[in-house]
From Swiss-Prot:
It catalyses: betaine aldehyde + NAD(+) + H2O = glycine betaine + NADH + 2 H(+). K(+) 2 binds at L245, K456, G459. This is Betaine aldehyde dehydrogenase. Disulfide bonds: none annotated. SUPFAM superfamilies: ALDH-like. Pathway: Amine and polyamine biosynthesis; betaine biosynthesis via choline pathway; betaine from betaine aldehyde: step 1/1. GO terms for biological process: glycine betaine biosynthetic process from choline. One of its GO terms (molecular function) is betaine-aldehyde dehydrogenase (NAD+) activity. Its cofactor is K(+). NAD(+) binds at G150, A151, W152, K176, P177, S178, E179, G229, V230, E231, T232, G253, C285, E386. K(+) 1 binds at T26, D93, V180.
């Protein structure tokens, strides 16, 4: 018997059975307990969801921006009222500590919906005078039906981040959460319906990558917003273009540098480094896993990092005192352990962790100890490739030019950060780093107002911020002639 029972699809304002006849299981990564059986969508189900979204979108788009704004604000209220309930589900599904999901996942998702609810009425066109008797005006119109494909590390937050600008601009969305963490997207669908979003405007189809491919290639989808790995993102982008030249937003992986200069406050720097590597058990795309430290302070910095790692409270995610939980799945655990073994084999010095935790209740979960490697080189696998787990690599440097060149020597470009008391150097360095999200003397905050996205192979487009809303609209130009029309023939 599962905890949450059979989970169906959400189409047209309510739950419906999938026609595939197939289900998949989702498990609690802390205990191995079966959480739910989830129905997998078929091609017919995807077609049904898209058709429902088209119908709902027509109604949604005819509402005034103020009406849409009020409905979205009601959804925000419901999310906040149910924060504890949703956080409990998210903790069971992802393995994140309850203190984290209570404070971050639903809160930040609701903040983004509230932000775009406020911007819905600010969508406007331009008037361009041509001559005394003629002018052009532009309209920003919704795209139509968009597809959202979520990642497993922030299920409800990602669903909120993708739906908020889409719905605020008058679009509908068919959303596919990760099959690893599929539960809370359905709860968001319930909330949108209860808030007054018309049936079909937000549909949820469940399944593996084949369902994502059906959405990406669907001729009636106007845009795809995807969060996930680089290689999968390339496939999504290729299929989106080949099928119908869809617009895309890609939030992909990272191998982000954190640069600690010789004048840094070492306590602040160590706090930032530990947060940038071990928050959410290291399963954050923006993690600063390449920690470059000036040679003159490397030993002192490393000691402060290790002191903080010892204070990490690994435990049951449902315990309020826990601040470090399991990895999301057995597959992710195996992947991370493989990287750790690679680091050892290539000569990195293991300073902390490096093992799976199996004592007591840890034995039934996907736990790996917070891991720190020293004496790392740029050519090591643990330094070059995204691990998506709690593995910090410490590298030393001597000069500003050197560390900037090394930090940029990657095909990733999602995030970067510097720690220094010299603000001139901080800004100078940040301006030269090839990354879309940067932090000075802090790490990790992504408020609704801040555009999020990467350079290079870390993504295309942005989420959050004013600019994102524009990418869920298309511009129509209209010329108006008030004077006499002069025929050509």
């Amino acid at each position: 018997m599962s905890v949450y029972g059979l989970q169906r699809l959400y189409i047209g304002g309510g739950y419906v059975d999938a026609t595939s006849g197939k289900t998949f299981d989702t498990f609690d990564p802390a205990t191995g307990e079966l959480l739910a059986q989830v129905q997998q969508a078929s091609a017919a189900d995807v077609d049904r969801a898209v058709a429902s979204a088209q119908e709902g979108q027509r109604e949604w788009a005819t509402m005034t921006a103020m009406q849409r704004s009020r409905i979205l604000r009601r959804a925000v209220d419901l999310l906040r009222e149910r924060n504890d309930e949703l956080a409990a589900i998210e903790t069971r599904d992802t393995g994140k500590p309850i203190g984290e999901t209570l404070a971050v996942d639903i809160v930040t998702g609701a903040d983004v919906i509230e932000y775009y609810a406020g911007l819905a009425t600010a969508i406007e066109g331009l008037q361009v005078p041509l001559r005394a008797e003629s002018f052009v005006y532009t309209r920003r119109e919704p795209l139509g039906v968009c597809a959202g494909i979520g990642a497993w590390n922030y299920p409800i937050q990602i669903a909120c981040w993708k739906t908020a600008p889409a719905l605020a601009a008058g679009n509908a969305m068919v959303f596919k959460p990760s099959e690893v963490t599929p539960l809370t997207a359905l709860k968001l669908a319930e909330i949108y319906t209860e808030a007054g979003v018309p049936a079909g405007v937000f549909n949820v189809v469940q399944g593996d990558g084949s369902v994502g491919a059906l959405l990406t290639g669907h001729p009636d989808i106007a845009k795809v917003s995807f969060t996930g790995g680089v290689e999968t993102g390339k496939k999504v982008m290729s299929l989106a273009g080949a099928s119908s030249l869809k617009e895309v937003t890609m939030e992909l992986g990272g191998k982000s540098p954190l640069i600690v200069f010789d004048d840094a406050d070492l306590d602040r720097a160590a706090d930032i480094a530990v947060t940038a590597n071990f928050f959410s058990s290291g399963q954050v795309c923006t993690n600063g896993t390449r920690v470059f430290v000036h040679r003159s302070i490397k030993d002192a910095f490393t000691q402060k990092v290790l002191e903080r790692v010892k204070r990490i409270r690994v435990g049951k995610p449902t315990d309020a005192d826990t601040n470090f939980g399991p990895l999301v799945s057995a597959a992710q655990l195996d992947k991370v352990l493989g990287f750790i073994e690679s680091g050892k084999a290539e000569g990195a010095k293991l300073l902390a962790g490096g093992t799976r935790l199996t004592d007591g209740h840890f034995g039934s979960g996907q736990y790996v100890a917070p891991t720190v490697f020293g004496d790392c080189r740029d050519d090591m696998k643990i330094v070059r490739e995204e691990i998506f787990g709690p593995v910090m690599s410490i590298l030393e440097f001597e000069s500003e030019d050197e560390v900037i060149a090394r930090a940029n020597d990657t095909h990733y470009g999602l995030a970067a950060g510097v720690v220094t008391e010299n603000l001139s150097r901080a800004h100078r360095t940040i301006h030269r780093l090839e990354a879309g999200i940067c932090w000075i003397n802090t790490w990790g905050e992504s408020p609704a107002e801040m555009p999020v996205g990467g350079y290079k192979q870390s993504g295309v487009g942005r989420e959050n911020g004013i600019t994102t809303l524009e990418h869920y609209t298309r511009i129509k130009s209209v010329q108006v002639e008030l004077g006499r029309y002069n025929p050509v023939f």
